[in-house]
Amino acid sequence: MIIHGFTPVRSAGFLISCSVFVLQFAVGQSKDSSQAISVSGFVDAYYSKNFADPASHANKLRNFDIPENQINLSLAEIVLQKKAQPIGFRVDVDFGTANDVVQGIAPYGTTPYSTLTNIQQAYLTGVIPIGNGLTADVGKFVTHMGYEVIESKDNWNYSRSLLFAWAIPYYHTGLRLTYPFADNFTVALHVVNGWNSNIDNNAEKSLGLAVSYSPSGSTGLMLNVMDGFEQPPPFDVGKKKVFDFIVTQNVTDAFALTLNADYGDETLISGLKTWRGAAVYGRYAFNAKSAVALRGEIFDDPEGYATGLGVPQLDVKEVTATYEYKFVDALLVRGEARYDFSTTPIFDKKANVNTVNGQMTFLVGVVAMF
């Protein structure tokens, strides 16, 4: 709920003021503590054109590049971090339409605005001296699920995959325990309040598991699992679970491949709902400044539940090509062409025209980092 006298505008201003204060404090502290506290961030903006000219001016089935035919501030982020030696912390403060989607606030959701809305992550971290060192994180943190992440600069493509948008959560609030059994084998356990939840909506905790293994320096394997009740009483009749599998392969120093596959289901009063999909990625770096990346994927949503469209036998595919160039280390520019298509006509077109089976978009994204 919104506290009387503490409107979204006032709270946003309050958070900005706090961020500036903490930033100044952190810089001062880092000078006195041999850079113990690191400060970084970026501003991410884009322009997208949908050639179907949708009357809604929205790219259907996207999550972080929804508005089209307009310049959009996707994400502005400030990160303050102190490594656990043995105690540390991390705080990510976010603003922009991508953050609105992550937090589920209007116009992309119904979650009331709060001071937590602009906190992507905020957790305490500590290393417990057991064996190789058990790391414990307590607070709000991004999910371990999926190959892609919220920040576009850390992905191979600018737009996010269907799997990232619809198959998995964005963040959790709770406890994360990580233990490195070896340099190439790590296991993490999560006990959290559920999917995209600051406060749990039922009496049960959700469990997460992340297992990563690198059989060689060029190959990486990861299995991620989420399992728990996600509906409020009296609708919490069954669990929601997702299995997420990732394989990465550096073929050469310049060429890399990735496979990401997901399966999820949830038991509701109305029955079992399922979703599944897979994405294949390839990236070739011409040099330190420029690279090209391709992504192809399929997402199957038989009951239309994961996407929220309610369309039966929904089968969606997409192909994305992205070229990137770094003018300087702190400025990343990307041009991207993407085609989404479905067995069912779900994509918007011009006013008074029926929906169509596909949409073609072109996007230019710019990220300035510090």
PLM regions with names:
Residues K49-Q70, N99-Q121, V127-S216, M222-F229, ...:
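Surface-exposed coil loops of outer-membrane beta-barrel proteins
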Residues G41, N69, L73, I78-K82, ...:
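Residues on the lipid-exposed face of transmembrane beta-strands in outer-membrane beta-barrel proteins
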Residues M1-S33:
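Cleavable N-terminal export/targeting peptides
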Residues I66-N99:
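Glycine- and aromatic-enriched membrane insertion/assembly motifs of diderm outer-membrane
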Residues R62-D65, N99-V102, G109-T115, V149, ...:
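Outer-membrane beta-barrel pore domains
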